Design a protein with these regions (language model features):
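Conserved PLP-binding catalytic core of the aspartate aminotransferase-like
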Residues: 2-38, 58, 101-109
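PLP-dependent enzyme catalytic core of the Aspartate aminotransferase-like
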Residues: 42-113
Length: 113
């Protein structure tokens, strides 16, 4: 699966420890949290606490794995196609942008009084 993600330049990978999969992002981004909604649209509900985790039972079949893999790939492709992973901003660039937006909102709020 990670090979396909890399080949398609999708900025994520999946690591696992037996029955726990962790969705990791390979590039900084401020909208990674939205991936859970793309997964849900593909029929895969994932609770989102920091990096996403999928828990599977020990009797998970190869067919079940293929369904999850397909949902993850379709969701990642859709998120990329929608432009949420465009750009090459670094983590510090993103922090600066968010800081400027917050400062602007505080100034705008004070001026609106």
């Amino acid at each position: 699966m990670n090979k396909v993600l890399a080949e398609e330049d999708l900025p994520m990978r999946v690591d696992n420890l037996t029955t726990v999969w962790t969705v990791l992002f390979t590039r900084p981004g401020r909208y990674h949290w939205m991936f859970q909604y793309y997964l849900r649209a593909e029929g895969l509900a994932l609770s989102w606490v920091g990096t996403g985790r999928c828990l599977f039972s020990l009797d998970f079949s190869e067919a079940d794995y293929e369904k999850v893999k397909g949902a993850l790939l379709r969701a990642a492709r859709a998120m990329k196609a929608d432009g949420w992973w465009d750009g090459n901003a670094s983590a510090s660039d993103i922090s600066k942008i968010i800081g400027k937006e917050m400062a602007w909102q505080m100034v705008a709020r004070r001026l609106a009084r």
